Amino acid sequence: MNALQEDTPPGPSTVFRPPTSSRPLETPHCREIRIGIAGITITLSLCGCANARAPTLRSATADNSESTGFKNVPDLRTDQPKPPSKKRSCDPSEYRVSELKESLITTTPSRPRTAKRRIRL
């Protein structure tokens, strides 16, 4: 009836056509893409495609690469220790000196001091 027989192989989902030439077509609209996955290099020739830049953080050619497909890629780990930062001093006398220097630099006129009168009871 409508049941599949066990000896019938499923139909192919993709069709493989071997390349007619290993040389890429030499037209200005043809691009070659190489993808390296676990020691296997896949080369795709895309003809009739437009140029589009897609910058990534980790991208490199897979030539002579055996394990990862990346070659001469900078290390992007963030768990490296940071260089020591310059510590600020907490000495109050240094703060007062810098405060006095700032007051000498300012050009705004200060208001004249007035004598305080104290009332004694």
Curated annotation (Swiss-Prot):
Has the keyword Repeat been applied to this entry? no
Biased composition, Polar residues: where in the chain?
58-70
Q: Show the GO cellular component annotation of the record.
A: host cell nucleus
Quick check: keyword Transmembrane helix in the entry? no
Q: Where is the composition biased (Basic and acidic residues)?
A: 88-102
Q: Name one GO biological process term.
A: symbiont-mediated perturbation of host exit from mitosis
Name the segments for region: Disordered. 1-28, 57-121
Which compartments does it reside in?
Host nucleus
Which Pfam families does the annotation name?
A: CAV_VP3 (PF04771)
Induction or repression: VP1 and VP2 are detected 12 hours post infection, while VP3 only after 24 hours.
User: What exactly does this protein do?
Assistant: May act as transcriptional regulator. Induces apoptosis in infected cells. Element of infectious replication cycle.
> Member of which family?
Belongs to the gyrovirus apoptin family.
Q: Under what name is this protein listed? A: Apoptin
Recorded source organism is Chicken anemia virus (isolate Germany Cuxhaven-1)
The opening ranks of the lineage are:
Viruses, Viruses incertae sedis, Anelloviridae, Gyrovirus, Gyrovirus chickenanemia
